[in-house]
UniProtKB/Swiss-Prot annotation:
Role this protein plays: May be involved in transcriptional regulation.
Compartments where located: Nucleus
Example GO molecular function: RNA polymerase II transcription regulatory region sequence-specific DNA binding
Keywords: DNA-binding, Metal-binding, Nucleus, Repeat, Transcription, Transcription regulation, Zinc, Zinc-finger
Protein name in UniProt: Zinc finger protein 563
Gene Ontology cellular component list: nucleus
Length: 476
């Protein structure tokens, strides 16, 4: 099973084969490939029914057309018998059910498997050009819920189905239901746990070869998608499209509950979960649930003792490279993400977004019990304690409740006497990382952030800035 990629639907000729084609045949080839590229974004999530190794065994795997005969320059030069495999069955299979009768083109008597394939074939036979994307022409099919426009009616239908709320396809193994057959097939592969495609460099395994190809770019550094406006390059097409919308400001997905506009479908789905509270990703070890799969993957690493990323300045270790990089910015004082309104700098883009809500007044978190709206999820959780009378995370020893699991874990260490942070210089053990960092300053007598007035050194830039304000008050 494989995601549809450009390589899967492209038609390739050798130089010798290309030389045998006439001008009209070459024009036909260009036309078909242009349409394929334009619609690749619509079809990229359609999954194949069978493994790659079976794709040539099944006679239904290829859709054969004799368009060359219809598009040759001279009527006398037709009937060449040449066939071209234009689009793999992975695309048209979505509209072909078992036992479906083949369709016949009234124009040229060619027998074609599948109504979708027939419609596409008739358009080419008649010379009719399908609707194109907005930059090329009109998009006649508009999604009523999201307001997104599509060039093809079948693309519109496939996008429209998930919003009906009906989930007709059920997994017999776990009982989970899905809105489309392809999502069920995708789930079944993941449920089976078989990952046959392995990276030769690091050994990581994947369900589909397309995911393996994408992963390999993290090793090679290949970035084939380049932004025409700022020349920034991206390894994945989805990343490139998200970046492009930053320039255009395009946000085609609108939330029904709060009217917030979002640039892509994945952001839209994640945002919807902030309203519904849905957390479909559950940790098998502790049962904790998450709204996005990346959060689950990050959480799962906390069950392993391995923390490969260590800060050389304070000795703190991390499970993730991203967390380590954020931590290092606190030492260096690097704040590359600036607020567009007031210019204030932050070390993370998420903090900029939170800060900008102060200017815009946006409050996306609404309490269902009293109707109060809040700008940040942390404020929302604190507010909910007023209604519930406690946090969701309780100490196993004394029963004290906490809003955050990290605070609860830190509290539990005070009962157990656990002190995981050990100073390599004097052997002293401490229970919290903040205490350990303060202790390390006693040995070094120095920190990377120095006061511009008196030269005193600090571990954190925020503490240094707070100290500098004491000098400023003295001058008043």
């Amino acid at each position: 099973m494989d995601a549809v990629a450009f390589e899967d639907v492209a038609v390739n000729f050798t130089q010798e084969e290309w030389a045998l084609l006439g001008p009209s045949q070459k024009n036909l080839y260009r036309y078909v490939m242009q349409e394929t590229i334009r619609n690749l974004d619509c079809i990229r999530m359609i999954w194949e029914e069978q493994n790659t190794e079976d794709q040539y065994k099944n006679p239904r795997r290829n859709l054969r057309c004799h368009m060359v005969e219809r598009f040759s320059e001279s009527k006398d030069s037709s009937q060449c018998g040449e066939t071209f495999s234009l689009i793999r069955d992975s695309i048209v299979n979505n509209s072909i059910c078992p036992g479906e009768d083949p369709c016949q083109s009234a124009e040229c008597e060619e027998v074609i498997m599948g109504h979708l394939s027939l419609n596409s074939h008739i358009r080419v036979d008649s010379g009719h050009k399908p609707h194109e994307y907005q930059e090329y022409g009109e998009k006649p099919h508009t999604h009523k819920q999201r307001g997104k426009a599509f060039s093809y009616h079948h693309s519109f239908q496939s996008r429209g189905r998930p919003h009906t709320g009906k989930k007709r396809y059920e997994c017999k193994e776990c009982g989970k239901t899905f809105s489309s057959r392809r999502n069920l097939r995708r789930h079944m592969v993941v449920q089976g746990g078989n990952r046959p495609y392995k990276c030769k460099l690091c050994g990581k395994a994947f369900f589909w070869p397309s995911l393996l190809r994408m992963h390999e770019r993290t090793h090679t550094g290949e970035k084939p998608y380049e932004c025409k406006q700022c020349s920034k390059a991206f390894p994945f097409y989805s990343s490139y499209r998200r970046h492009e919308r930053m320039h255009t400001g395009e946000k085609p997905y609108e939330c029904k509950q709060c009217s917030k506009a979002l640039p892509d479908s994945s952001s839209y789905i994640r945002h919807e979960r902030t309203h519904t509270g849905e957390k479909p990703y559950t940790c098998k070890q502790c049962g904790k649930a998450f709204s996005v799969s990346s959060s689950l993957r990050r959480h799962e690493t906390t069950h392993s003792a391995e923390k490969p990323y260590e800060c050389k300045q304070c000795g703190k270790t991390f499970h993730h490279l991203g967390s380590f990089q954020i931590h290092m910015k606190r030492h260096t004082g690097d704040r590359p993400h600036k607020c567009k309104i007031c210019g204030k700098g932050f070390d993370r883009p998420s903090l900029v977004r939170y800060h900008e809500r102060i200017h815009t007044g946006e409050k996306p978190y609404e309490c269902k019990q009293c109707g109060k709206t809040l700008s940040h999820s942390s404020s929302f959780r604190r507010h909910m304690i007023m209604h519930t009378g406690g946090g969701p995370h309780k100490c196993k020893i004394c029963g004290k409740a906490f809003v955050y699991p990290s605070v609860c874990q830190r509290h539990e260490k005070s009962h157990s006497g656990e002190k995981p942070y050990e100073c390599k210089q004097c052997g002293k053990a401490l229970s919290h990382s903040s205490s350990f960092r303060r202790h390390m300053v006693m040995h070094t007598g120095d920190g990377p952030n120095k006061c511009k007035v008196c030269g005193k050194a600090f571990v954190y830039p925020s503490v240094c800035q707070r100290h500098e304000k004491t000098h400023w008050r003295e001058t008043i």
